[in-house]
């Protein structure tokens, strides 16, 4: 059996970093990364990007050497992705923060609203409902991270955790400050507005969870398999008939419900920013589906049925 020789060069300087002799033709990029780490332990596999061209796209870990457009002497170009951190760690950190921060304002710990309000409780029922909804949302996210989500990528750049936490933690503090403020004003339309908002929030939370479970069942544990998601017997998944990312649709709906419930400007802004970001993600995933699957349902839109 003919073996390959693999030369790894720096994508920026073209400097030769490593030469691997007698590499199996069936070796994957993941295995080549492991071999490279043996000579350069500071660059563990998760922070390596290997490509055929210095300015080209990164090769996938599952790509097989003999199936790449290279000869028996292959040249790969290396880029350092920087320090990496697991997606699970990032999600747990960015979701635990808002849960804890919101409760600090809810219980009115000292140095927030003034001494006379320390550890006092709001007289408005909607404030307590808002705390329950907010806490439920982030506890759900934490549990889904631990027991439901299956990540196609194991890590992300370490710097992202600071950006993500600033976003989630900052908005949580901003909205919690006003919702739990001693001078907070309840919703204009009273009980009817609260009931409507709670219904929207609960339905969308159930829908979001249902979509996450459906997506989980599409990907076997430990794999990166991608399939077209279709509706199941669960009515909440029927939104797959119209959009590619109904989990985002339900997520946006949850925050709209929370904004109606609290009638709070920071919540409305958080919903708007979240919708903008999730629309970008949804469009990206929608394009990937269309590119990867020729039989992808043509009626689907990225996030909003018939519109967007």
Curated annotation (Swiss-Prot):
The UniProt record lists the keyword Lipid metabolism: yes
N6-acetyllysine found at: 22, 60
Post-translational modification: Glycosylated.
Protein name: Very-long-chain enoyl-CoA reductase
Family under the similarity heading: Belongs to the steroid 5-alpha reductase family.
Source organism of this protein record: Mus musculus
Listed InterPro entries: 3-oxo-5_a-steroid_4-DH_C (IPR001104), SRD5A/TECR (IPR039357), TECR-like_N (IPR049127), Ubiquitin-like_domsf (IPR029071)
Function description: Involved in both the production of very long-chain fatty acids for sphingolipid synthesis and the degradation of the sphingosine moiety in sphingolipids through the sphingosine 1-phosphate metabolic pathway. Catalyzes the last of the four reactions of the long-chain fatty acids elongation cycle. This endoplasmic reticulum-bound enzymatic process, allows the addition of 2 carbons to the chain of long- and very long-chain fatty acids/VLCFAs per cycle.
Gene3D superfamilies: Phosphatidylinositol 3-kinase Catalytic Subunit, Chain A, domain 1 (3.10.20.90)
Entry's localization field: Endoplasmic reticulum membrane
